[in-house]
Amino acid sequence: MELQVVGANALAVSETTFGREFNEALIHQVVVAYAAGARQGSRAQKTRAEVSGSGKKPWRQKGTGRARSGDIKSPIWRSGGITFAAKPQDHSQKVNKKMYRGAIKSILSELVRQDRLVVVDKFEIDAPKTKVLVQKLKDLALEDVLIITASLDENLFLAARNLYKVDVRDVQGIDPVSLIAFNKVVVTVDAVKQIEEMLA
């Protein structure tokens, strides 16, 4: 199959990478696993055993007229322990390489079908200026966009940092969440070739 390159001849690409069937279940599983892996998982609360304080019974069991109480660290009390205290945990989920690559291929194929993948010969700017990048994107009628280059262009990266709906990645930095998060994905010809090699 071929992908149309803006202002140039069509680029021949692999059917298995850019012409794959849409697999929603696989993409969902991989995206959930990716998001789970990004969780910090460091929250920690204290149980009644871990809260600092005396273990003495606050008042006698009977005769005061108050509700019976055996411990100031009881979860019922203010400043007491948490009943089912959260502990640090690893939320990451295992995803096989074949599944991960399959999900990326499926996303790329769907981007092609929806005309959301824009292939350009090169994507460069002369200076790390946000207004220069904004003008270049305006010329291509692009706004909410992920730009993928073969290697990270420092000028592009610096110019895009201040733009909320623009992100710049190299081929090694792409992930399923970023691919589906933007309205358009701009890829250079060299990046397309690298992606094919990476997913082969």
UniProtKB/Swiss-Prot annotation:
Cited InterPro entries: Ribosomal_uL4, Ribosomal_uL4-like, Ribosomal_uL4_dom_sf
UniProt-annotated stretches for the region Disordered: 43-71
Keyword line: Ribonucleoprotein, Ribosomal protein, RNA-binding, rRNA-binding
Family annotation (Gene3D superfamilies): 3.40.1370.10
Coiled coil feature spans: none
Classification via SUPFAM superfamilies: Ribosomal protein L4
A GO MF term: structural constituent of ribosome
Source taxon at top rank: Bacteria
Signal peptide: none
Subunit record text: Part of the 50S ribosomal subunit.
The protein's name in its UniProt record: Large ribosomal subunit protein uL4
